[in-house]
Amino acid sequence: DYSEDLRIDKNILIQHAESYRKIRNTFRFMLGNLKDNFEKQDFEKIKLAEFDELEQFILHKLSAISDSVTENLNSYNLHRLYKELLNFCALDLSSFHFDIRKDVLYCDSINSKKRKNCVIVLNIILESLLKWFAPILVFTTEEIYSLVSKKNESIHENNFVKIPSNWKNDKLNEKWSNLFKIKQETNIAIEKKRTSKEIGSSLEAEIKLSINKEKFELLNDIDLAEYFIVSKAEKKLSEQDRIEIEVSKAKGSKCERCWKIIETVSYTH
């Protein structure tokens, strides 16, 4: 930030180290799941209709960030750009998208359409973040790019990614922003059970949501157990606007493959 004198002390350095760790962990997750199979995608050929809404929502987020990247770089607001990219890594990706999609990436068949689409989006995110972070994390992005690029070139010689305008979807953004609020409330209820030692991880829980008609319809097309990262989830209509969340320990046995608590574990699960 060139607009004021630089402030530095031990606490500030600790904060920056923690922020950098979050960014590195975001890249590490993508690299681990891509397993050296990074492939540049032709953004214009991406067929949004073939992707789940969650992936479409993340692509919308990339579109919004792309506009902000251009604006901040043109005005030399690198500190503002850094904060926005950090929040995207920590909140939208690590704590939300990656958390939900771990089960798909780790347990689904390598040939499943859902997993393939998830991997495509990881490729898109990785390529975009590498270029956007390049002016700020010069050496880190160069190191990562040298691992994934099949060409002997520098990340700093590449052009910026161009996000297609049709990835922007304000209606979908509003829907998933509201879904995110429901997830936050559910996470709080689950965390209380974890704190009291009634359950360990969230996958040991089953939840029952009592919600009004608006929120009920909002969750209609959502795999509730996958979205809330629990073993079982149900919803029922309520006349109250306030969400009521009942969290209990799931009944059954732990599946060694997906770690969910299933009443009957079989090879077909």
How would you describe each model-predicted region?
Residues 255:
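Short cysteine-rich clusters marking metal-coordination/redox-active sites
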Residues 1-49, 149-150, 198-201:
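Catalytic adenosine-cofactor/nucleotide-binding cores of aminoacyl-tRNA synthetases and other
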Residues 36-67, 98-189, 196-211, 234, ...:
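Acidic, turn-prone loop/beta-hairpin segments
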Residues 268-269:
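Conserved small/polar residues in nucleotide/adenosyl-binding loops
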Residues 259-262:
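Cys/His-coordinated zinc-binding microdomains
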Residues 245-251, 265:
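Short, flexible, mixed-charge glycine/proline-rich loop motifs
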Residues 18-29, 56-64, 83-103:
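Core structural elements
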Residues 6-31, 83-86, 117-142:
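Structured ligand/cofactor/substrate-binding pocket environments in proteins
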